[in-house]
Amino acid sequence: MKVFKNLFLLAVSAAVSVCANAQQSGIDSTGLPGDNFSLQGALEMFQKAASPEDFEKLINEENNNVNNLDLNGDGDVDYVKVIDKVDKEVHALVLQVSVSETENQDIAVIEIEKTGDENAILQIIGDEDIYGEQVIVEPASEDGGAFNFYGGSTHSGPSADAVQQRNGIVANVWLWPSVRFIYAPAYRPWISPWRWHLYPVWWKPWKPYAWHVWHPRVVVFQRPFVVVRTHRVVRAHAIYKPLRVTSATVHTRHAASVNHYRVTRTKTTHTGPGGTTIRTTTTVKKNGHLKGKKTTVRRRR
């Protein structure tokens, strides 16, 4: 009995410690719907998945800690469906939620282009109605899995000049199983068969987690992926842009938090001596206190 009591007290102490660390970490929720969907987590699931169908299942499994969205406020987490928009060797995999019987809302889109026989690039872009602005995330380039990208052509080996606009050293995702799958000759574009109140039998909605519980679960995804400000996959983005789907319900319900985010997040860019570009980004917390300030310097070559 004494051993059981000690184990119980130890478990309670550990739980309290985890909760306290999350609350005292200084990381505040933005109040945006995007707080509850991990773009980095979605990319990790896509990297693991064997196909778009498998990817859809992975992002909707509770224990994978990718999705915690409740866009319509019904108290249950939403099911995220995947729809592949294809034009030749360009793919735009749309991640979308059925908000009601008549409305859908795009959460993000994974844009993919094949740039060579054994080269492909991708980015995931969070929707501005969900994240307050377009948030672009891509795999971090790694030695042996990266190549120089020059707006559509590829060159092996590093290059210090490949840094402006679409050019750069990017991760090659050609060996990801799901990427190979969608470029197979027999592939038929995946269009999720599920819709409002019609979901797969394996999926059961759960109650959304509170921020202090949810956030520690998703931070583990952030290291292999980076947030960038450059659209590299421009052909896929051009295909997706006119097909973007938004919901009036989501826009109305979250308009205040989205507008507040856009007002409090300021960006200042100016050009210094020698053509040096300096960008300063300031984000203010919901309580009006300064959350963070980042300055990026890019020198013209």
Annotate each PLM feature.
Residues Q24-E44:
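Short N-terminal segments immediately surrounding and downstream of signal-peptide cleavage
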Residues S38-E61:
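Extracellular/luminal recognition modules and glycoprotein regions
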